[in-house]
Amino acid sequence: MGINWKEYSSGNFYDELISSPGNARIYARGLIAYLGSLTAGEMELRQQAADIVIREMGISFTVYSDGENIDRSWPLDIIPRIIDYKEWTTVAEGLKQRLKALNCFINDVYNEQQIIQDGIVPAELILKSRNFLRPCCGIKPPHGVWANICGSDLVRDDKGLFCVLEDNLRVPSGVSYMME
């Protein structure tokens, strides 16, 4: 027997698939019906198979902490996140706007430094950062684009609103896994 959606509760968390116990969101009904047809054992086997493929393909990421480089397998939930098209269109536009703002920030840091002069960000926070690259001062990349790609980690709050947990501009490795 599959998942009993009538008894399922996401507690205080927003659920992208289920709006209330037993009620799938319109755009997730097909997936919910399919998942409901699988037993817990079948779901577990599918997750294990995905984990094995990821490990065998060497899909991993490195956690850099305290001088250690720890390789970890890339986590993949076999249940996809389904996001309504209209909602995703809004999020995508916001992410594009965010990347433009990040590029403007980096360009300012390495050129005019208006953000420092205006007292918005303390000089020492930027200038003493181990990630601040003094040789980049004065560089003006084409169109002011320092980062062509950004890995923004999205989460939802309890009301279902998207929030950016962090932006990864250095090495947004997750994107390359999607290309694989």
What residues fall within each predicted segment?
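Preference for protein termini
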Residues: 1-180
